[in-house]
A protein has these predicted regions:
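Conserved C-terminal helix/tail region of periplasmic/extracytoplasmic solute-binding proteins
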Residues: 74-152
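Secondary-structure end/capping motifs
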Residues: 1-101
Length: 152
């Protein structure tokens, strides 16, 4: 968590890019990654936005970028069902509850002296750019709403 907080700070972006750009990590020039870390977006055709609020998130305001939301895990599992990687009868909630240890994250945050961090399990209903809605309490409805799925 401390590393995530460090990575989130703008004054550390250059050093972070130098570290992760090394051969043993990404093996890329710093210039290839520093802009994205800082929120610079190259839209092409000379249109570049610098310092946007679209910088990569590692921590967020109160840890929400790293918090293990069970609702997001439910979406990932649902997508795996969608594409045939998991069986259609997979018990999503049971699998999430067996594998997601948000309690350990919360305990770690407390040990680190962090306050105001997330404590619930869900970000709520998510609406995507295509208008589709994922309700973690009803993943089957999301699956039924999708026209594009695994082709048998």
């Amino acid at each position: 968590m401390e590393a995530q907080i460090w990575c989130e700070k703008m004054e550390n972006k250059q050093e972070m890019a130098e570290i992760v750009g090394r051969r043993q990590w990404f093996n890329v020039p710093v210039t290839d990654i520093i802009g994205r870390l800082r929120g610079d977006i190259n839209y092409g055709h000379g249109r570049v936005a610098r310092g946007t609020n679209l910088a990569m998130k590692f921590w967020g305001e109160k840890g929400e970028a790293s918090y293990p939301w069970k609702s997001l895990d439910a979406w990932f599992i649902t997508e795996n069902i969608r594409w045939g990687k998991f069986e259609a009868n997979t018990d999503i909630k049971a699998l999430v509850n067996r594998t997601n240890r948000s309690d350990l994250w919360i305990e770690g945050a407390k040990l680190a002296g962090l306050t105001g961090t997330p404590t619930g399990d869900s970000r709520g209903v998510e609406k995507f750019f295509d208008g589709k809605v994922f309700d973690p309490a009803n993943p089957e409805a999301y699956l039924k709403s999708l026209a594009v799925k695994r082709i048998a």
